[in-house]
């Protein structure tokens, strides 16, 4: 397929630009079109200068574990934080991590430092930045319960430090106004026993492996749980377990997970999700909200 890219005049940066990047290789679903430009900043200051000096649309991608990139073009610039933003520092019961850090690595570092309260991160695929963006949570814990502060670049290219209260968290979202790129976060846990923390983490991993299609090409939880309900139960009762459109299928193991069973397009996945929403709404009068995020344009 031929894509008509715009020859953008990009700001000078210390990091790197790549043009015409095929996004399907970067997503857990293994679907998606082409990004016009991907930018990897070399530092927070480099990122801030880029934001100040461009008027192009900006989107941010981590490891794309809870993201469907549509089949067409992702316009503008996709910011991808690299290894310069993957670090962990522990001090007592406080732990700071760059936003490209994997959540599983954060959980392990906390355990090794005897910091409890962050065990739930071990079962969540994704990065610290993605978790901050959507108030990720599992097994009774979430970002809002352990976050102390987050450093971010706002849409004006200013580097800001935001408190937990500033984030105005609610279920699977924050309440910030405007566009933000999170660069690192500081969490507070409690002093705990390393062996006990490791035991809890092993339990969470076992529960995840037993209940979720961890070996499939999936993107994590598809829909938010409506108040008073479990999304998977509504989906199951609406007759959607195993439902398939094209190469996309509702997981037989956990109904709130979609799978790329081979050859699926982003449109297959989105159409399947919308079919689920229609069936659940028709049967229960409940509108399921996407937890998975979308990026880019369809064909």
From Swiss-Prot:
Cell wall formation. It is found in: Cytoplasm. GO terms for molecular function: FAD binding; UDP-N-acetylmuramate dehydrogenase activity. GO terms for cellular component: cytosol. Pathway: Cell wall biogenesis; peptidoglycan biosynthesis. Belongs to the MurB family. It comes from the Bacteria. The active site is at 172, 221 (proton donor), 291. It catalyses: UDP-N-acetyl-alpha-D-muramate + NADP(+) = UDP-N-acetyl-3-O-(1-carboxyvinyl)-alpha-D-glucosamine + NADPH + H(+). Keywords: Cell cycle, Cell division, Cell shape, Cell wall biogenesis/degradation, Cytoplasm, FAD, Flavoprotein, NADP, Oxidoreductase, Peptidoglycan synthesis. Its EC number is 1.3.1.98. It is an enzyme of class 1 (oxidoreductase). Its cofactor is FAD. This is UDP-N-acetylenolpyruvoylglucosamine reductase. It comes from Anaplasma marginale (strain Florida). The gene is murB. Residues 31-192 form the FAD-binding PCMH-type domain. GO terms for biological process: cell division; cell wall organization; peptidoglycan biosynthetic process; regulation of cell shape. Pfam families: FAD_binding_4, MurB_C. Gene3D superfamilies: 3.30.465.10, UDP-N-acetylenolpyruvoylglucosamine reductase, C-terminal domain, Uridine Diphospho-n-acetylenolpyruvylglucosamine Reductase, domain 2. The keyword Membrane does not apply.
